[in-house]
Amino acid sequence: MLKPQDMLVTLELAAHEGEPWTYEALASELGMSASGVHAAVDRAGTCGLLNPKTRTPLRPALLEFLVHGVRYVFPAELGRRRRGMLTGASAVPLSQHLASTETSPLVWPYARGEARGESLTPLCETVPIAADRDPELYALLTLVDGIRVGGARVREVAAGVLTELLRR
Protein backbone atom coordinates (compact mmCIF):
# COMPACT_ATOMS: atom_id res chain seq x y z
CA MET A 1 0.00 0.00 0.00
CA LEU A 2 1.27 3.45 -0.92
CA LYS A 3 2.22 5.96 1.73
CA PRO A 4 2.35 9.73 1.23
CA GLN A 5 6.15 9.80 1.35
CA ASP A 6 6.18 7.37 -1.60
CA MET A 7 4.66 10.13 -3.73
CA LEU A 8 7.30 12.60 -2.55
CA VAL A 9 10.11 10.21 -3.50
CA THR A 10 8.50 9.28 -6.83
CA LEU A 11 7.94 12.92 -7.77
CA GLU A 12 11.55 13.75 -6.88
CA LEU A 13 12.74 10.94 -9.16
CA ALA A 14 10.40 12.15 -11.92
CA ALA A 15 11.64 15.73 -11.54
CA HIS A 16 15.26 14.63 -11.99
CA GLU A 17 14.98 11.51 -14.14
CA GLY A 18 18.26 10.53 -15.72
CA GLU A 19 20.34 12.12 -12.98
CA PRO A 20 22.36 9.72 -10.81
CA TRP A 21 21.20 9.37 -7.22
CA THR A 22 21.80 7.37 -4.06
CA TYR A 23 19.40 6.56 -1.26
CA GLU A 24 21.47 8.69 1.11
CA ALA A 25 21.52 11.71 -1.20
CA LEU A 26 17.80 11.44 -1.90
CA ALA A 27 17.10 11.09 1.82
CA SER A 28 19.11 14.22 2.58
CA GLU A 29 17.36 16.18 -0.18
CA LEU A 30 13.88 15.12 0.99
CA GLY A 31 14.43 15.28 4.75
CA MET A 32 13.88 11.54 5.15
CA SER A 33 15.96 8.58 6.27
CA ALA A 34 17.76 6.43 3.71
CA SER A 35 15.75 3.41 4.86
CA GLY A 36 12.54 5.43 4.42
CA VAL A 37 13.53 6.32 0.85
CA HIS A 38 14.43 2.69 0.13
CA ALA A 39 11.04 1.51 1.43
CA ALA A 40 9.27 4.21 -0.61
CA VAL A 41 11.06 3.14 -3.80
CA ASP A 42 10.12 -0.49 -3.11
CA ARG A 43 6.44 0.36 -2.53
CA ALA A 44 6.27 2.61 -5.60
CA GLY A 45 7.82 -0.19 -7.65
CA THR A 46 5.34 -2.72 -6.32
CA CYS A 47 2.45 -0.38 -7.17
CA GLY A 48 3.70 0.19 -10.72
CA LEU A 49 4.72 3.83 -10.36
CA LEU A 50 8.44 3.05 -10.66
CA ASN A 51 10.21 0.39 -12.70
CA PRO A 52 11.33 -2.04 -9.98
CA LYS A 53 14.57 -2.90 -11.80
CA THR A 54 15.75 0.53 -12.97
CA ARG A 55 14.01 2.54 -10.20
CA THR A 56 12.86 5.08 -12.79
CA PRO A 57 9.36 6.56 -12.95
CA LEU A 58 6.81 4.87 -15.17
CA ARG A 59 5.47 8.21 -16.33
CA PRO A 60 2.17 7.07 -17.92
CA ALA A 61 1.20 5.14 -14.77
CA LEU A 62 2.37 7.96 -12.50
CA LEU A 63 0.42 10.53 -14.47
CA GLU A 64 -2.71 8.39 -14.46
CA PHE A 65 -2.49 7.94 -10.69
CA LEU A 66 -1.84 11.62 -10.04
CA VAL A 67 -4.68 12.82 -12.27
CA HIS A 68 -7.29 10.22 -11.31
CA GLY A 69 -6.35 8.72 -7.96
CA VAL A 70 -4.25 10.91 -5.70
CA ARG A 71 -7.16 13.03 -4.44
CA TYR A 72 -8.95 9.88 -3.23
CA VAL A 73 -5.94 8.07 -1.77
CA PHE A 74 -4.42 11.16 -0.12
CA PRO A 75 -7.34 13.58 0.42
CA ALA A 76 -6.63 17.22 1.22
CA GLU A 77 -7.01 18.47 4.79
CA LEU A 78 -7.59 22.21 5.11
CA GLY A 79 -6.89 24.09 8.32
CA ARG A 80 -6.75 27.55 9.83
CA ARG A 81 -4.85 30.55 8.48
CA ARG A 82 -1.12 30.11 8.89
CA ARG A 83 2.21 31.28 7.61
CA GLY A 84 3.76 29.02 5.01
CA MET A 85 4.63 28.27 1.38
CA LEU A 86 2.11 28.81 -1.38
CA THR A 87 0.63 25.69 -2.94
CA GLY A 88 -2.15 24.55 -5.26
CA ALA A 89 -3.76 27.26 -7.39
CA SER A 90 -1.97 29.92 -5.31
CA ALA A 91 1.51 28.85 -6.47
CA VAL A 92 3.43 28.91 -9.74
CA PRO A 93 3.00 27.20 -12.18
CA LEU A 94 -0.75 26.78 -11.64
CA SER A 95 -1.36 30.42 -10.70
CA GLN A 96 0.00 31.46 -14.11
CA HIS A 97 -2.80 29.55 -15.85
CA LEU A 98 -5.75 30.68 -13.74
CA ALA A 99 -7.43 34.03 -13.26
CA SER A 100 -6.68 35.53 -9.86
CA THR A 101 -9.41 35.25 -7.26
CA GLU A 102 -9.85 37.14 -4.03
CA THR A 103 -9.92 34.00 -1.89
CA SER A 104 -7.29 33.32 0.74
CA PRO A 105 -4.21 31.62 -0.72
CA LEU A 106 -3.42 28.02 0.16
CA VAL A 107 -0.19 27.39 2.05
CA TRP A 108 1.71 24.49 3.52
CA PRO A 109 2.45 25.42 7.13
CA TYR A 110 6.15 26.30 7.16
CA ALA A 111 8.02 28.63 9.51
CA ARG A 112 10.27 29.91 6.72
CA GLY A 113 7.33 30.56 4.39
CA GLU A 114 6.58 34.11 3.29
CA ALA A 115 2.82 33.89 2.68
CA ARG A 116 -0.22 33.77 4.94
CA GLY A 117 -3.28 31.81 4.00
CA GLU A 118 -5.50 28.83 4.60
CA SER A 119 -3.31 25.90 5.54
CA LEU A 120 -3.27 22.68 3.56
CA THR A 121 -1.65 19.67 5.16
CA PRO A 122 1.09 18.55 2.74
CA LEU A 123 1.39 14.96 1.54
CA CYS A 124 3.97 14.40 4.27
CA GLU A 125 5.65 16.61 6.83
CA THR A 126 8.92 17.07 4.94
CA VAL A 127 7.26 18.41 1.77
CA PRO A 128 7.85 22.13 2.52
CA ILE A 129 11.52 21.53 3.33
CA ALA A 130 12.08 19.45 0.18
CA ALA A 131 10.12 21.90 -1.99
CA ASP A 132 12.10 24.84 -0.60
CA ARG A 133 15.31 23.14 -1.78
CA ASP A 134 14.10 22.05 -5.23
CA PRO A 135 12.04 24.26 -7.58
CA GLU A 136 11.22 21.40 -9.99
CA LEU A 137 9.86 19.25 -7.17
CA TYR A 138 7.99 22.26 -5.76
CA ALA A 139 6.20 22.77 -9.09
CA LEU A 140 5.11 19.12 -9.25
CA LEU A 141 3.93 19.09 -5.64
CA THR A 142 1.86 22.26 -6.03
CA LEU A 143 0.20 20.81 -9.13
CA VAL A 144 -0.63 17.63 -7.20
CA ASP A 145 -2.18 19.82 -4.50
CA GLY A 146 -4.21 21.58 -7.18
CA ILE A 147 -5.64 18.18 -8.08
CA ARG A 148 -6.13 17.18 -4.42
CA VAL A 149 -7.97 20.31 -3.30
CA GLY A 150 -9.12 22.25 -6.36
CA GLY A 151 -12.49 22.48 -8.00
CA ALA A 152 -13.16 21.02 -11.44
CA ARG A 153 -11.48 23.86 -13.36
CA VAL A 154 -8.39 23.92 -11.14
CA ARG A 155 -8.06 20.12 -11.37
CA GLU A 156 -8.37 20.25 -15.15
CA VAL A 157 -5.69 22.93 -15.53
CA ALA A 158 -3.40 21.25 -12.97
CA ALA A 159 -3.73 17.93 -14.80
CA GLY A 160 -2.84 19.62 -18.10
CA VAL A 161 0.24 21.35 -16.72
CA LEU A 162 1.31 18.20 -14.87
CA THR A 163 0.92 16.18 -18.07
CA GLU A 164 3.08 18.70 -19.92
CA LEU A 165 5.82 18.59 -17.26
CA LEU A 166 5.86 14.80 -16.91
CA ARG A 167 5.95 14.17 -20.65
CA ARG A 168 9.20 16.11 -21.12
Predicted segments with their positions:
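Short amphipathic alpha-helical boundary/capping segments
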Residues: M1-L2, A130
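Short, cationic-aromatic polyanion-contact patches
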Residues: L2-D6, E19-T22, P52-R82
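Hydrophobic residues on short alpha-helical segments
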Residues: M7-A14
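Short acidic, hydrophobic short linear motifs in intrinsically disordered regions
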Residues: G18-L30
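Basic amphipathic alpha-helical segments that dock to polyanions
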Residues: L26, G36-L50
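Helix-turn-helix DNA-binding motif, specifically the short coil turn and the N-cap/start of the second
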Residues: S33
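Exposed, interaction-prone assembly regions rather than primary DNA-binding/catalytic cores
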Residues: F74-G160
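N-terminal, charged low-complexity regulatory/assembly segments
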Residues: V161-R168
